[in-house]
Amino acid sequence: MRARNLMRLASVASVCSLIAACGSSAPADISAPTASVGAIPLLARASTRRLLDWPEFGLNPQRTDVSESATDITGANVAHLRRVQLKLAGTVDSSPIYLHDALVGGAAHNVIVLTTTYGKTLAIDADSSRTLWTFTPSGYQNWAGSAQITTVSPLADPDRRFVYAASPDGLIHKLSLAGGSEDSAGAWPVSITRDATHEKLGSALNIDGSDLIATTSGYFGDAPTYQGHVVLISRSSGKLQGVFNTLCANRRTIMVPSSCAQSDSAILSRGGAVVEPGGGRLLIDTGNAHWNGATDFGDSVLELAVPGLTLRQAFTPTDQETLNASDLDLGSSAPALLGEDRIVLAGKDGIMRVLALSRLSGRPPSSRETLGGEVQRLPAPGGGELFTAPAVWRRDGRTTMFVADENATAAYVMRRGRLYLAWENHTAGTSPVMAGGLLYVYEPSAGGIYVYHPGSPSPIAKLPGAPGHWNSPIVVDGHVVEPEGNANDHSLSGTLEIFSAG
């Protein structure tokens, strides 16, 4: 996860030549077979159901970022939404969440909840744009304005009474939705690192049954020592239910980072841990670090069993050493669940890898981890580095995936376990979302949200906005909500865009 290497390989082709030289058993070609846009299902109209809540990054624990339910925003009115810009007491370099008709301050509100890079969590009325409450973590003044930040998206408890949020001191907080007060019962708030100055809380929180899932990474520049790890936290008590360290994996507690001989292996993706359908298993992937297939898992995809967070199987590409040496983190984007026993991931090398979920390494799960085994490799959109989360739409037995990166936005369809490129344009984007039959992609360099019909690379509208970084929108209950700004600017202010129908 080191800062972008100025000597980075100039193109996907040059990376491909290095991979070919490795003599892998992986597919030899790196190409994008094509399909017509007609392969993308038609959605004549949104479901009669309305999408009222957006409780976490990716909408659900599987991080699909897709809902066919109606949002009250259509192709006919999307270019005419009412725009409100709010100045915030901090930058939100992540995504917000939303709850319809939530009880706050004794009254029902349609509530946006978001967390700034220095750990302030705010609840905002989506209709009036009024701030309902602000939670400021203890110690805020100690890191405000510094490089010690968080980019964690908050998560709403299914009971709608609490929200969970992170702060740069390594704590996960349980906050009352009614007023923003901190729940200190049991073990709350929960520390998930022994050194918050080196281990960053960067990826979105997730949930699996009674447990909250959180992960750690490193800061920009990769100052050692840190180890990416994932933790399970009881939502009720705050008790740690499990820990998996991606380095020194034989140690099952939260370590002092300097006590492990290896460093890095960040879990740095926007999506963090992805929960498989039905729960009980989750997927993570890691950034640059040492790999030995036993205790150290740099540049790998790991499937962990819940509740013990035991390693079930793993995938590591044959060119892992090259990725590590060249700062080409495999895990810059989380695994995306495609269905039909397939997942896909893409990293900073500009290559998407399709894996069989039942056999990540191409072999039955076992304690002996080996290199290689992907089903397919193809270029990321425009050959770009991928730091975003794909959106995956399954309809009528077909899978469509939307991906955006620093170079392009693209749509892929899956046939017989392989991905085919249906369309691509040259517009950069962060994590796409599809809601109510429309696709929304925030463009972080120039700002603004491009809106598409899923079957076309030509936008039907662009919502105005300012530049950002990893921010991505949500579209729910008649609103498009998009935070703006870059965490690496270390600013104490930011902007929130709210576009509303009616």
Annotated model-derived regions:
Residues 1-12:
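Bacterial N-terminal signal peptides that target proteins for export
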Residues 48-70:
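Predominantly extracellular/luminal regions of secreted and cell-surface proteins
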